[in-house]
Amino acid sequence: MTLAVLIVAAGKGTRAGGGLAKQWRPLAGRLVIDWTIEAFQRAGCGTIMVVRDPDNEHAIEALAPYPELLLADGGPSRSESVRNGLIALQEIGVERVLIHDAARPCVCPQVIQQVLDALDDTPAAAPGLAVTDALWTGADGHVTGTQDRSALFAAQTPQGFHFDAILAAHMRHDGTAADDVEVARQAGLAVRITPGDVNNIKITRPEDFSRAEHILRSTMDNIPDIRLGNGYDVHRFGPGDHVMLCGVQVPHERGLQGHSDADVGMHAVTDALYGAMAEGDIGRHFPPSDPQWKGAASDIFLRHAVELARSKGFTINNVDCTLVCEYPKVGPHAEAMRARMAEIMGMDMGRLSIKATTSERLGFTGRKEGIAALATATLVRA
């Protein structure tokens, strides 16, 4: 049975505020339309068409990452936009269609599937929520009466139809309609009510964005929180007979200068961990103006960053550190450095890389004036 989804996204959405149609606005790190499209992709709906304003630059930009989508031009009203989409779908031989508001990004697979199941033995089906609030009639700011709510439902989408039936209904329809169920009923189609979902809200007012974000983020609880941090550090050479690199004392004719032990590699890794947590850098936690850190072993800083990550629920997934210098030679000490860093961070050596390169005699490292280090760390919180 050939199924298509028709997402109606040609509206202006002015009541939601923000100076931009709601379907093109950001929501929980993405755009509203992204969440809506993904909801149907997750539900296994392969053919998706979006009806949009072809001249809207925000629509063009938002839909560019989806080359697999079918597109149709919107009309001056919702019903005309739907009609345009249905006519376009007619060319690909659709048997069933789900028509959905782009501004309902929180629709869940269960709601979608229940509509599809109902179409096995009825020409039209749509989700609805039984009205539970008391209903009043009113005039001039005063209550004039109450309304029986026992037979009232709040309509939702997607609204599903046998394709030929709803296409014929729209082709005969003249005028506006609240939704496609109204068009179907005017054409004499029986419409079954399937269970709605309180979270399947339609973004209409500005405050709906915060509610929708809360709903979407609650569904993301099983998605790992993955953080990436970068660290960079430099220390110049000075008097001494060794350098500290990634926790290992490496004999050398010169030392590295710094407020602490100047372990440039460990500092870069530490800053990468802080960066992944948005916790600043070493200087924020261990100010160089504080004399107690003069000459301090850098593993103090690294251990603090590791413990802070664990206190926030993060696991250190992997660390990659590159030392940039002409000398000393790092290769003979690299495994000892990996072992020491893995011990401090409590991680498997297979997830920790320490390597070295030169700058081809360019810059301060090429002139043998000091050592630079770059590090990347990935943290994961389940």
Curated annotation (Swiss-Prot):
Q: Name one GO molecular function term.
A: 2-C-methyl-D-erythritol 2,4-cyclodiphosphate synthase activity
Q: Give the UniProt record's GO annotations in the biological process aspect.
A: isopentenyl diphosphate biosynthetic process, methylerythritol 4-phosphate pathway; terpenoid biosynthetic process
Its pathway is: Isoprenoid biosynthesis; isopentenyl diphosphate biosynthesis via DXP pathway; isopentenyl diphosphate from 1-deoxy-D-xylulose 5-phosphate: step 2/6; Isoprenoid biosynthesis; isopentenyl diphosphate biosynthesis via DXP pathway; isopentenyl diphosphate from 1-deoxy-D-xylulose 5-phosphate: step 4/6
Q: Where is this region: 2-C-methyl-D-erythritol 2,4-cyclodiphosphate synthase?
A: 227-382
* Biological classification of the source: Bacteria, Pseudomonadati, Pseudomonadota, Alphaproteobacteria, Rhodobacterales
List, separated by semicolons, the cofactors it needs. Answer: a divalent metal cation
Q: Where is this site: Transition state stabilizer?
A: R15, K22, H259, T358
Question: Which residues are recorded as binding a divalent metal cation?
Answer: D233, H235, H267
Which stretches does the entry tag as region 2-C-methyl-D-erythritol 4-phosphate cytidylyltransferase? 1-226
Gene3D superfamilies from the xrefs? 2-C-methyl-D-erythritol 2,4-cyclodiphosphate synthase, Spore Coat Polysaccharide Biosynthesis Protein SpsA, Chain A
> Which gene codes for it?
ispDF
What family, per the record? In the N-terminal section; belongs to the IspD/TarI cytidylyltransferase family. IspD subfamily. In the C-terminal section; belongs to the IspF family.
| The enzyme's E.C. designation | 2.7.7.60, 4.6.1.12
Function description: Bifunctional enzyme that catalyzes the formation of 4-diphosphocytidyl-2-C-methyl-D-erythritol from CTP and 2-C-methyl-D-erythritol 4-phosphate (MEP) (IspD), and catalyzes the conversion of 4-diphosphocytidyl-2-C-methyl-D-erythritol 2-phosphate (CDP-ME2P) to 2-C-methyl-D-erythritol 2,4-cyclodiphosphate (ME-CPP) with a corresponding release of cytidine 5-monophosphate (CMP) (IspF).
- Protein name as catalogued: Bifunctional enzyme IspD/IspF
